[in-house]
């Protein structure tokens, strides 16, 4: 059963988003939305609590998911009334994270997020558990309050140290890729980032219609371009996540953001106000991690919208859009045009060199895109494309530049 409390009818919290999240792990059979101010004891109204308790008995509900953030006492009180496990939105997201955390780093990041969620609640959870077992509070009663709090703090410190070491490995790996142009994909879950990655690279990475299919970074080379351009996809954003959860995954987000070019991927079929809000969040997160790379705004799923919707997006959201392009990764619409835009915004320049130096020729073939290679009088006249700074450096170093 899914329950969502909204402050007013204008509250943008979405039961559809909660349902989409829940369906990753469970089979929701009932959804309830209540509009009212938060109740300090239950989060939702006490009258509704009584009615839900009856429904749970009648319909054999096994778990209740509340789409708001519960205090430990609210969770305890609801579990006591419902006699089944109760979790809130953050706990649901953490469980989804665990499902998709396949690497050591992803598992550590999920555990860190879980512990940072747990820390301010630790003392209260232990205190409540000692009052009597309720679903979801098992085991906490075995701890002394302060000892459990300190245990959580120590584990957080240990995980942060481990993640920093892994982060350093990432920096080394990024240096190894420095000779290639890099493109990072940023966006909300289900905007179609993974589908876009597949379309750009010709790969067939898992692309389920579920949130958080991608938790770790994935890097592939763009197909159909002579120059080697690497694209990185990473964890998608979701609404109302507290800062500590975003922070736990910053290292994977940074992997995309530390690129020569950023593609902000947006679901063009969303409502215009929703697109606006998500674009603002994307730019805020890029600003938070001090990303200075140029941006292309990729409106995916153009096959699902009308020309009029496209016009409205461009007119009404002009201040939030940088270098827009409308594509469909699924149906290969405008994907070649997107590749051209990527090359254009990577600030690639063209240079020409006349040389018979085999080491230089080998270097050019390995590190630049060769446009033309003409052999004349035992010398190669090579026209190549690379980052502007690299072209200038190569031409400067080579006295035979023409």
From Swiss-Prot:
It comes from the Archaea. GO terms for molecular function: GTP binding; GTPase activity; metal ion binding; ribosome binding. InterPro entries: G_HFLX_dom (IPR030394), GTP-bd (IPR006073), GTP-bd_M (IPR032305), GTPase_HflX (IPR016496), GTPase_HflX_N (IPR025121), GTPase_HflX_N_sf (IPR042108), P-loop_NTPase (IPR027417), Small_GTP-bd (IPR005225). Mg(2+) binds at residues 194, 214. The keyword Protease does not apply. CDD domains: HflX. Its cofactor is Mg(2+). GO terms for cellular component: cytoplasm. Keywords: Cytoplasm, GTP-binding, Magnesium, Metal-binding, Nucleotide-binding. It is found in: Cytoplasm. Residues 181-350 form the Hflx-type G domain. NCBIfam families: GTP_HflX, small_GTP. Belongs to the TRAFAC class OBG-HflX-like GTPase superfamily. HflX GTPase family. Monomer. Associates with the 50S ribosomal subunit. GTPase that associates with the 50S ribosomal subunit and may have a role during protein synthesis or ribosome biogenesis. This is GTPase HflX. It comes from Methanocaldococcus jannaschii (strain ATCC 43067 / DSM 2661 / JAL-1 / JCM 10045 / NBRC 100440). The lineage of its organism: Archaea, Methanobacteriati, Methanobacteriota, Methanomada group, Methanococci.
């Amino acid at each position: 059963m899914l329950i969502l409390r909204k402050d007013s009818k204008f509250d943008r919290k979405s039961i559809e988003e909660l349902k989409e999240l829940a369906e990753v792990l469970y089979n929701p059979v009932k959804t309830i939305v209540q509009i009212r101010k938060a109740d300090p004891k239950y989060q939702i109204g006490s009258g509704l609590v009584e009615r839900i308790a009856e429904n749970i008995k009648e319909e054999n509900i096994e778990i209740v998911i509340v789409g708001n953030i519960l205090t430990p006492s609210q969770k305890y009180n609801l579990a006591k009334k419902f006699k089944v496990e109760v979790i809130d939105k953050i706990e649901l997201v953490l469980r989804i994270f665990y499902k998709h955390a396949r690497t050591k780093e992803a598992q550590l990041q999920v555990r860190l997020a879980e512990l940072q969620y747990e820390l301010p609640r630790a003392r209260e959870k232990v205190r409540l558990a000692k009052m009597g077992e309720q679903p979801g509070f098992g085991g906490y009663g075995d701890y002394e309050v302060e000892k459990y709090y300190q245990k959580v703090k120590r584990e957080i410190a240990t995980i942060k140290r481990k993640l920093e070491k892994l982060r350093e490995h990432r920096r080394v790996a990024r240096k190894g890729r420095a000779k290639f142009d890099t493109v990072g994909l940023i966006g909300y879950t289900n905007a179609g980032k993974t589908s876009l990655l597949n379309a750009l690279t010709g790969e067939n990475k898992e692309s389920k219609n579920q949130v958080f299919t991608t938790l770790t970074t994935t890097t592939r080379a763009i197909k159909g371009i002579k120059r080697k351009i690497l694209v990185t996809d990473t964890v998608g954003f979701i609404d109302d996540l507290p800062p500590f959860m975003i922070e736990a995954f910053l290292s994977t987000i940074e992997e995309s953001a530390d690129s020569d070019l950023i593609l902000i991927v947006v679901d063009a079929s969303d409502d215009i106000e929703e697109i606006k809000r998500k674009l603002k969040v994307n730019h805020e997160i890029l600003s938070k991690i001090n990303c200075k790379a140029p941006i292309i705004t990729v409106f995916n799923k153009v096959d699902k919208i009308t020309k009029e919707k496209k016009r409205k997006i461009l007119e009404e959201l002009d201040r939030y859009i940088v270098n827009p392009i409308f594509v469909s990764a699924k149906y290969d619409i405008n994907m070649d045009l997107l590749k051209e835009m990527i090359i254009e915004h990577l600030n690639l320049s063209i240079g020409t060199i006349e040389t018979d130096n085999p080491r230089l020729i080998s270097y050019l073939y390995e590190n630049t895109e060769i446009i033309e290679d003409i052999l004349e009088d035992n010398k190669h006249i090579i026209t190549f494309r690379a980052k502007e700074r690299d072209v200038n450096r190569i031409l400067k170093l080579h006295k035979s530049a023409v």
